[in-house]
Amino acid sequence: PRRSTTTKLLDGLAQRGVKATFFLIGLNLDGNEDLVLRMDREGHQIGLHSYNHKLLTGLSTADFYTEVGALREKLTDLLGHNDFVLRPPYGKTDAGVRKLAGAPIILWSIDPEDWSDTDTARQTAHIVSQAQDGDIILLHDIYPSSVETALQVVDALLDEGFYFVTVDELFAAKGIILEDGQRYTCAKGG
């Protein structure tokens, strides 16, 4: 989380009654514990993204633990639960990541590449034109333009009759049981 942008996003989601899943980077937790507690308290799902946003493929077991296990422990200590999903940095996985994940691996079906394009109108149009039932949309909460895009997408898709839910709620609604080490990009079954 980033205090200014994440707070604005949480406020906007709360005003709209919308829940989301946040994949957190360990380095960004210090000093932002209250934001993470707020996410959890308001019904958002918390996921693991890694400690240092380091590529997880090819890591030794010890290095994987440094990136994922340490974040899992930190979040478990803070939140009092350990029911996390994992989104590897850059969406990159291999057999080692799948073996060591200890959680379902959640990727995405719509990626507007908001890290490289700050045009909110273009981002919003891209997402809204592609969105279908069961999609997982990747956006970041650290860029002001991404937060604006997220809230505009929520408004547009709510107007079209879409519902927004956490990753766990999405797959449960589709009758899909998430399994540790398995990769998921959307929930189109059921």
Can you say where each PLM-predicted feature lies in the sequence?
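Active-site beta->alpha N-cap acidic-glycine motif
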Residues: 1-77, 81-83, 156, 163, ...
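Short alpha-helix boundary/capping motifs
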Residues: 3, 29, 90-91, 147
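Alpha-helical scaffold elements lining the catalytic groove of polysaccharide deacetylases
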Residues: 8, 54-81, 92-133, 146-152
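Divalent metal-coordination and catalytic microenvironments
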Residues: 13, 46, 86-89, 105, ...
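C-terminal domain-boundary segment and adjacent tail
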Residues: 15-16, 28-30, 145-190
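Active-site-proximal beta-strand/loop segments in catalytic clefts of secreted hydrolases
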Residues: 23-27, 50-51, 87-91, 108-111, ...
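A polyampholytic, Gly/Pro-enriched intrinsically disordered region
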Residues: 127-135, 184-190
